[in-house]
Curated annotation (Swiss-Prot):
GO terms for biological process: methanogenesis, from carbon dioxide; one-carbon metabolic process. Belongs to the FTR family. This is Formylmethanofuran--tetrahydromethanopterin formyltransferase. Its EC number is 2.3.1.101. It is found in: Cytoplasm. GO terms for cellular component: cytoplasm. Pfam families: FTR, FTR_C. Catalyzes the reversible transfer of a formyl group from formylmethanofuran (formyl-MFR) to tetrahydromethanopterin (H(4)MPT) to produce 5-formyl tetrahydromethanopterin (5-formyl-H(4)MPT) and methanofuran (MFR). It comes from Methanosarcina barkeri (strain Fusaro / DSM 804). Keywords: Acyltransferase, Cytoplasm, Methanogenesis, One-carbon metabolism, Transferase.
């Protein structure tokens, strides 16, 4: 299969189950909503070494937020619900409560699983907290130096999916990077998914385990490293490719990830010099979800 003259390899992305909480952060301005969201989703690229995977899902206009202010939806992902609640308390408590003019609301109010994060955060007020209603939602008011921090009582979570992905092969580093940026920018407009790596782009895609250093649980995926393609017998790098970037996608459900992969790939192949699109899988060892590239189109 080719799209815009770019080969789409007949392969699939392998993904795995994960628990996802969705939080709506609002602030007086879009700038401060984004600052708080960026801080709250830091150090969360991969569960390989991070305590969570997290990222910004999308912006929310004042017309769709409970308090009528600019907002940002974020997703926070862990393997277990217990760890997810800890991450919510730590990230909201340290990165949102401390940020100017912010408030937090439940991004999954209909979810069966609910954490009483706002209820627990109210204890920061040391007895001076109070309750109010905003757009029919129970919210706690925590007095702080600038005024009041507002936190909805509960934050919802569901069983989602992590590890949807695709690889972009370019004739140069700048070609591949430009295509990856185009893909991430397009995915950022969609609902239900995040791209948790720096700027949404993975420069150092890994394989599970190691060939030599067995004490590591993930190491460089040498088959996709252009600088050593002449040294690797089973290299996946064509002669005319000199850089590869991976886009990793987590999402609330399969359809959201499929939509993000499709949109991202369509954006990437518009960049001249992109030679091929592929995806990462581990023969079923990593997860139960398979997103076949050809079936996306």
């Amino acid at each position: 299969m080719e799209i815009n003259g770019v080969e789409i390899e007949d392969t699939y992305a392998e993904a795995f189950p994960i628990k996802i909480a969705r939080v709506l952060i609002t602030a007086a301005t879009k700038r401060w909503a984004l600052v708080a969201a960026t801080e709250a989703t830091g150090f969360a690229t991969s569960v390989i070494m991070c305590p969570a995977e997290a990222g910004i899902e999308r912006l929310a206009s004042p017309s769709e937020t409970p308090d009528g202010r600019p907002g940002v939806y974020v997703q926070i992902c862990t393997f277990k619900y217990e760890a997810l609640e800890e991450q919510l308390l730590e990230r909201i408590g340290q990165c949102v409560l401390t940020a100017p003019t912010t408030a937090v609301f439940n991004g999954l109010p209909e979810a069966e699983k609910q954490f009483n994060v706002g209820f627990k955060l109210k204890f920061f007020a040391d007895g001076m907290e109070s309750e109010t209603q905003i757009a029919g939602r129970k919210v706690y008011k925590v007095p702080i130096m600038e005024g009041d921090f507002l936190a909805e009582e509960n934050i919802g979570a569901i069983a989602g999916i992590a590890g949807g992905n695709f690889f972009i092969f370019g004739d140069s580093q700048m070609t591949a990077l430009t295509a990856a940026e185009a893909a991430v920018d397009t995915i950022a407009e969609l609902e239900g998914t995040i791209t948790p790596f720096p700027g949404g782009i993975v420069a150092s895609g890994s394989k599970s385990g190691a060939n030599k250093y067995k004490f590591l649980k993930a190491t460089a995926n040498e088959r996709f490293c252009p600088s050593i393609k002449d040294k690797i017998e089973n290299t996946e790098i064509p002669a005319d490719v000199n850089a590869v970037y991976e886009i990793v996608i987590n999402g609330l459900d399969e359809e959201s990830i499929k939509a993000a992969m499709k949109a991202g790939i369509k954006a990437a192949v518009t960049v001249p010099g992109v030679k091929k699109i592929s995806a990462g899988n581990y023969g079923g060892k990593l997860g139960k979800y398979q997103f076949k590239l050809h079936e996306l189109f």
